[in-house]
Amino acid sequence: MSYQHPTDLALVPELLALAPAEGKTFLAFNHAAERADGAIPAKYRELIALGVAFTTQCAYCIDTHTRHAREAGATKQEIAEAAFVAAAVRAGGTLAHALLSLRLHDSPEK
């Protein structure tokens, strides 16, 4: 069983119609965050988006941002490095939560 299927994207209009205010706000936010005229050049913006897509495991996002990164001039080497940066940050978050767990373990219960 696959949880994400390309045909699911055909349901986007229905999702937006079911929650029009939220959908409109989300699309406006998404377009603003992914705009081409920002301080971050398009290639790096797409590599950032791709790194996030790897950690959130969004197949649709990986598909879209891989294509956009390639179109913006990103190389396979840059994509590979972005993947390892994302993996390292994700692993760092795991260790940070381990520190929290150690502190909570040693603190008196409330």
Model-derived segments and spans:
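Iron-sulfur (Fe-S) cluster-binding segments and ferredoxin-like electron-carrier domains
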Residues: G23-T25, D63-E78, L102
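Charged/polar positions within long, soluble alpha-helices
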Residues: Y60-D63, R67, A91-T94
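C-terminal structural segments of small proteins and small subunits
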Residues: A80-L104
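Alpha-helical scaffolds flanking conserved acidic
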Residues: A42-L47, K76-A82
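Short, thiol/selenol-centered motifs that function as redox-active sites or metal-ligating centers
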Residues: I48, V52-T64
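Acidic, glycine/proline-rich low-complexity segments that act as flexible tails and inter-domain linkers
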Residues: M1-E46, A96-K110
